[in-house]
């Protein structure tokens, strides 16, 4: 998504888990919804999560390719964005959470031998 004129990406990996837990009541990730459901805290929470998840994405890209220069999203990048952008930001955050929590299983092809092969 575009924020402050730049395309931004978000990624939820182990690196981001502790930082996001620190934002939750009692540092309990299962209570993150309390922050998003409180109107006076939801915008601040979304911005904080976006900054953390973007840093995770940028650091991951740099780790994969050391020539990649991270360009981190900052809280100030949101200063002159319309409030309506927060719906899209929240959607992107939730998408990153879903992707980061998705379990994948690698399987090897079955090598059948014998009579039924």
What are these regions (language model features)?
Residues 10:
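Active-site-adjacent beta-strand anchor residues
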Residues 44-56, 91, 95:
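Short, hydrophobic/amphipathic alpha-helical patches that form generic packing surfaces
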Residues 17-19:
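A short local loop/turn or secondary-structure capping micro-motif enriched for an aromatic residue
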